[in-house]
């Protein structure tokens, strides 16, 4: 006599076999629409990129099911033998990629990586010295609205008014005056190389820890196409997306064993619990991709494309902060066209070109208005755009923004429609996840 199926067998089978398209059409619809947006819009947000199918596979794997508080070999849960393998691989690849001795791959974001460093190496009320947000710095470097600006006494250096390069004389003066616990180099909208040796010399003069936040340019460092923060930095933080082309997350690197020990404790149990093992797997895959020779070819193209884009914009009457770029991004000063960043971002969005409004040094406009836009080449380069395509993108941007300059905020509808069609056609020539 055959036994009846166990209660719940059918529903259990559906649970493990049904895709989101079947179980949650609202979410599936939003995902599909976002895929369509990414497929048919020119992505110029400098902090965004497009991951490989392999990274997507790892980040969407069964590793999401596993809790793994602690570190490889020292977990607070059983059954971690395979996620230990994943995290060890991620750590080893990160150390090889950046030629350093220690790596913590658990931070869930660049912000949490920075918070972890502060938690490890400073006390509330200590002074930190970083690049002003108004000059291209980052919120987590002591902006008043950020936790870093609430917990610490934040002092900020600027760029020079004429060149828009970091004013190292001011850095030294402020360091000597305020004796910061931590000096920070790096930012979110600074398009030039940074003199890490000069920063370290100042840090040594005042007994400060030197932190480099290379979230934006980590891929360029990994490829060996701009100078590495090591051996100058005591500690380095980064995101794992942006130019590294991995999943969204953070990482902390150092060559100092004592700092590494403090960092590990600061991340867990200090500010995080169980790490996101599926994301760490995605990081490991991305690091492996970045260790291949073709990654250097990719990053060189990223840099060439950013320069080409900037040159076309200058030819069409725009100004570039610092006069150009050494990296993956250009910061465009819109004042020669009498435009604001808000108007430019909206108009370009209508034409299927995605970017973000951004303040420029000594910006007369409010932070939610701005006098600039920030443009980056990583995502477009990932999908295959070369110099010719970025030159065309520069011309398309110019056409749209000239329409806004002439006609006001609503722009030139006919021009925007024509540019949108060209943007879609360009993207169709270089499809993603085809």
UniProtKB/Swiss-Prot annotation:
This is Serine hydroxymethyltransferase. GO terms for cellular component: cytosol. Its main location: cytoplasm. Its cofactor is pyridoxal 5'-phosphate. The record marks 241 as: Plays an important role in substrate specificity. Pathway: One-carbon metabolism; tetrahydrofolate interconversion; Amino-acid biosynthesis; glycine biosynthesis; glycine from L-serine: step 1/1. The modification N6-(pyridoxal phosphate)lysine is found at residue 242. Its EC number is 2.1.2.1. One of its GO terms (biological process) is glycine biosynthetic process from serine. Keywords: Amino-acid biosynthesis, Cytoplasm, One-carbon metabolism, Pyridoxal phosphate, Transferase. SUPFAM superfamilies: PLP-dependent transferases (SSF53383). It is found in: Cytoplasm. Pfam families: SHMT (PF00464). HAMAP family: SHMT. InterPro entries: PyrdxlP-dep_Trfase, PyrdxlP-dep_Trfase_major, PyrdxlP-dep_Trfase_small, Ser_HO-MeTrfase, Ser_HO-MeTrfase-like, Ser_HO-MeTrfase_PLP_BS, SHMT-like_dom. (6S)-5,6,7,8-tetrahydrofolate binds at residues 133, 137-139. Catalyzes the reversible interconversion of serine and glycine with tetrahydrofolate (THF) serving as the one-carbon carrier. This reaction serves as the major source of one-carbon groups required for the biosynthesis of purines, thymidylate, methionine, and other important biomolecules. Also exhibits THF-independent aldolase activity toward beta-hydroxyamino acids, producing glycine and aldehydes, via a retro-aldol mechanism. Homodimer. Gene3D superfamilies: Aspartate Aminotransferase, domain 1, Type I PLP-dependent aspartate aminotransferase-like (Major domain). The keyword Cytoplasm applies.
């Amino acid at each position: 006599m055959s036994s009846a199926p166990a209660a719940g067998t059918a529903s259990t089978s559906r649970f493990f076999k049904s895709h989101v398209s079947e179980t949650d059409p609202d979410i599936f619809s939003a995902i599909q629409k976002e895929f369509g947006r990414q497929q048919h819009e020119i992505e110029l947000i400098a902090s965004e990129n497009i991951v490989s199918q392999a990274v997507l596979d790892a980040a969407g794997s069964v590793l999401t099911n596993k809790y793994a508080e602690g570190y490889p070999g020292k977990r607070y849960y059983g059954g971690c033998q395979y996620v230990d393998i994943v995290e060890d691989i991620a750590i080893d690849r990160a150390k090889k990629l950046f030629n350093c001795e220690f790596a913590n791959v658990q931070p869930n974001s660049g912000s949490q990586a920075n918070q972890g460093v502060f938690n490890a190496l400073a006390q509330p009320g200590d002074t930190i010295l970083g690049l002003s947000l108004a000059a291209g710095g980052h919120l987590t470097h002591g902006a008043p609205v950020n936790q870093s600006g609430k917990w610490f006494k934040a002092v900020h250096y600027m760029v020079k008014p004429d060149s828009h390069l970091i004013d190292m004389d001011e850095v030294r003066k402020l360091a000597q005056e305020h004796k910061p616990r931590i000096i920070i180099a790096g930012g979110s909208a600074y398009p030039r190389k940074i003199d890490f040796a000069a920063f370290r010399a100042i840090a040594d003069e005042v007994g400060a820890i030197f932190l480099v936040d290379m979230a934006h340019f980590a891929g360029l460092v990994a490829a060996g196409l701009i100078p590495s923060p090591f051996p100058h930095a005591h500690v380095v933080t980064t995101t794992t997306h942006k130019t590294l082309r991995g999943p969204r997350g953070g990482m902390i690197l150092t060559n100092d064993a004592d700092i590494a020990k403090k960092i590990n404790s600061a991340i867990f149990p200090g500010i995080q619990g169980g790490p996101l093992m599926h994301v760490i797997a995605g990081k490991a895959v991305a690091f492996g991709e970045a260790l291949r020779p073709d990654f250097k070819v990719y990053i060189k193209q990223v840099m060439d494309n950013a320069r080409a884009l900037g040159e076309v914009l200058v030819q069409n009457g725009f100004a570039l902060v610092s006069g150009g770029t050494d990296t993956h991004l250009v910061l465009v000063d819109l004042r020669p066209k009498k435009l604001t960043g808000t108007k430019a971002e909206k108009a370009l969005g209508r034409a299927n070109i995605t970017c973000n409004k951004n303040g420029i040094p000594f910006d007369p406009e409010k932070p939610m208005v701005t006098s600039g836009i920030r443009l980056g080449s990583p995502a477009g380069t990932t999908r295959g755009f070369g110099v010719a395509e970025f030159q065309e993108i520069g011309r398309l941007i110019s056409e749209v923004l000239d329409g806004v300059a002439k006609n006001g905020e609503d722009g030139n509808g006919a021009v925007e429609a024509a540019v949108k069609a060209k943007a879609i056609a360009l993207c169709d020539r270089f499809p993603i996840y085809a």
